[in-house]
């Protein structure tokens, strides 16, 4: 919205600063951060008054029993902060802004309904797996179709392979839709599985969003894209605004979500943030880079799939408990040790992902 002020720069020279992506990206991050910090205490009080307390698994680590009753659904604060900040600082004429907000809020609505059933109706299972998959699939397919249309118009219907500048595989409509669907739905569920310890998913989301913001900035400028051998995606520079808003909102939320957490994000936050990250990766054609940067999310999801699949086949477990962060807790790691060490791993993975900008 503030971008419109740049049109009045003829009357007031200083207003032309609003046309610069870097300025608006920084302001989007600060706005979302301030929003989360300002409304965080109110959100916690409101969730507590509504008795939206998290029910902790009795078969999980015994140290988690003290978390029982901690307010959940705090992800609604994150989504509101991202939406408000993006609308204030983003370009409303850019279709990617609306696709990202649509995916964020649609998957957030699913997570909200799931959380609401768990905490208000005391339904430990929440919505059925079938209902959740249908909802996620519908959102992902609609977003994928919209992105395919935009990608087809800009000749960016390709698959980029990191570290190899000569490999850019044409996907076609089926390949594009399948890859986009798997990226969006897969990342959504992977982040949700990661969100099991205080701050464990929140900071990695910040790191991955920041990394993808750099790719979006480079891809949205033809000269940078050409120099770095990236696909030029017209309008991708506005995706930076969304990514930095996500960073700011999550950092503000982390203030209250850090150990010992005063509030959990719940499915409303985790499902939405994961889907948004996946959508950003599809827009900038960096699905493989997302796998690298979000390696923590990948490992968490794979650990669950391996555990479930192996147990069904052999009645034995590979890990002491899945997702894998609980495995290390059972091995004696303190919760804060698991969280910080997984953060460090994510920092390294994001740096490796960024190195693909030059190592080709």
From Swiss-Prot:
Pathway: Cell wall biogenesis; peptidoglycan biosynthesis. Keywords: Cell cycle, Cell division, Cell inner membrane, Cell membrane, Cell shape, Cell wall biogenesis/degradation, Magnesium, Membrane, Metal-binding, Peptidoglycan synthesis, Transferase, Transmembrane, Transmembrane helix. One of its GO terms (cellular component) is plasma membrane. It is a multi-pass membrane protein. Its main location: membrane. Its cofactor is Mg(2+). GO terms for biological process: cell division; cell wall macromolecule biosynthetic process; cell wall organization; peptidoglycan biosynthetic process; regulation of cell shape. The chain crosses the membrane at residues 24-44, 69-89, 92-112, 133-153, 158-178, 199-219, 239-259, 263-283, 288-308, 337-357. Pfam families: Glycos_transf_4. It is an enzyme of class 2 (transferase). HAMAP family: MraY. Belongs to the glycosyltransferase 4 family. MraY subfamily. This is Phospho-N-acetylmuramoyl-pentapeptide-transferase. It comes from Neisseria meningitidis serogroup B (strain ATCC BAA-335 / MC58).
